[in-house]
Amino acid sequence: ELRVYDAKRYGAAKEIVAGQICAIPNLNETFVGQGLGFLENDASSCMTPVLSYALNPNGCDLHACLVALKELEDEDEHLHVVWSKQLNELRVQLMGPIQLEVLQQILKDRYELDVSFEQGRTLYKETITQTIEGVGHFEPLRHYAEAHLIMEPGKPGSGLVFSSDCSLEELDKNWQNQILSCLKSKEHIGVLIGAPLTDVKITLATGRASIKHTVGGDFRQASGRAVRQGLMMLKERQGLKLLEPWYRFVLKVPEEKLGRAMNDIQQMSGTFSLDQATGTLSGLAPVSEMQSYAETVRTYTRGKGLLELSVDGYRQCHNEQEVVSNSSYDPLSDLENTPQSVFCAHGAGYTVDWSDVPKMAHEEYVLKG
């Protein structure tokens, strides 16, 4: 149904031509930039948030805050809302402090929620630098599934790409489709600090099902464990990499302050070039280092400096070892994303450590050596 509104009244229309505005009811899973019909999704319209802020309800009902933020999330592609049941914590992922101020005011004016937010944290991501075959086996009593996934480094900014190169003789098409569907629907996280996994090509190489015992959900378990098992193997081989967001900046300060500015950028692990004609510095720097630098510039230039920032994607984390060391994430304790497999013997299922899966797998490995 296509609706054309006039104030609060509307009429049904059979078609909409270019330039007209209409409403389509009962769309539950649409999102900003989604292509409808034959149009492809517009990925360019969605900038990825780079900072995370924890919400302080200040006495407001936390569930009411969650409902309001979820509604705003549907309206703004730059806003992501994350609810942690374990921590009883509500976080918003944004582009920066200006968007945060606007959000805070909207919550107050539109929903009468007078909340505050804690200091922003950088949103890291994880990726891989080597190719690996991850294996997941799920075989409690009266269940069976095994999945082999080839994980390869993807192009920067490509996200997660899924495909199948598995023979129909090895695994029925329905099972293959189920595996790919499960992989696409899950938010995969890394094993370094539990940050989202990105820029990885994941290909279903082979697998095994049981006519008698494989039921719905078994390959969801096996495929998820396969990804995690592959990541744990790469961690052991130092084949993982932590990524962080970087700013592209343009900094203009008085000539006598150029030395200070260049020294600051170097201290931030940034790179820059100097336009001698205008005295302008331009370059790249980590968001974690430069997110609060605008205030510093205003202070040491007495308001005469100008800093322009734009997010320029994710790059190698400049202090990876420090970030990983400061993280309390333990991939083996993350039961919702376990790398362990489950095998069956004597009528009972038992857990097998990720490192022992290669010698226990029922299907032969596709990658040799």
Identify the residue ranges that each predicted region occupies:
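Glycine- and Gly-Pro-enriched alpha-helical subdomains that act as flexible
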Residues: 207-246, 250, 255, 259-261
